[in-house]
């Protein structure tokens, strides 16, 4: 159960960075509530990490996969990316590099959402088949671990920032991020002691990928990407948010690539290297989307995605803006650390 607790901590700790630290950092640098609120959109990636879960199941990292296992290698890679992001944050000023800081925050969110895919699977593997009765206890321990990583990690983060500020350190948030890197390193040391089973599972997945590509599913996926991209583009234009507009254009380009792929297959057939490459992309991207909408229907599928997205966005904004509210009515970072984080961890 301690291994499951550690996995929960690893999963929850990145939220300290993009939910607590980033919000207060931007607030104390004098940025507006609307800017901080818009930055909360990076949490939307957690609602859609299932879209790239099939890709994660099929990726082999050179050396690492064979050395420590497939799932642990993915977690270690994502943790390394988060460390690099913290290094970048530690040398930036929000008033001068706002877009870059939010972009780095998005990279942390994507890395966190990606590692959650493998953390959940690795957590389940820690409970043996003959211990299936312990599954509920394992799920509870995972929740405890997540809240420990988020709340207790948030307490440590805010206390460090408060003490550095009181000591006269100018860029105390940037120095705080350096300290937080140490916590991530310690978590990865603990990760090395967690065993991983089912290493033959990777080859079994590849063996089932062979030739189940449906051209119509590729066309449907292209339409979906283009529709999402067009919606994001219009939202970005309406609110004058260039990074949202660029994200929409990226989705449109991805959709166009899939549509060109479907045309290529119809025109030249499937027995060539280019088609085989697109077949792989289809199996890990288009097929899961197509299966989701085929099982639920287009209307129900869109409704489910919209519900999850709106739920996560509401949760993200509430958490972020509550810290801004506490700061505006006079609470210090130390107060927030004690009453919101430490006591919140105990009660949760």
Put a short name on every predicted segment.
Residues 7-8, 15, 42, 46-49, ...:
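Substrate-agnostic recognition of the 12-TM MFS/MFS-like secondary transporter fold
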Residues 37, 75-76, 102, 174-178, ...:
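Hydrophobic/aromatic positions within or immediately flanking transmembrane alpha-helices
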Residues 35-62, 82, 342-348:
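Central cavity-lining transmembrane alpha-helices of secondary-active solute carriers
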Residues 90-102, 114, 126-310, 333:
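Intracellular loop-helix junctions on the cytosolic face of multi-pass helical membrane proteins
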Residues 26-27, 56, 60, 156-165, ...:
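Interfacial helix-cap and linker-helix signal at transmembrane-aqueous boundaries
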Residues 61-62, 73-96:
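C-terminal ends and interior cores of transmembrane alpha-helices
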Residues 43, 79-83, 181-185, 255-259, ...:
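Residue-level recognition of pore/gate-forming positions within transmembrane alpha-helices
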Residues 1-46, 107, 232-236, 300-325, ...:
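Helix-loop boundary and gating motifs at the non-cytosolic
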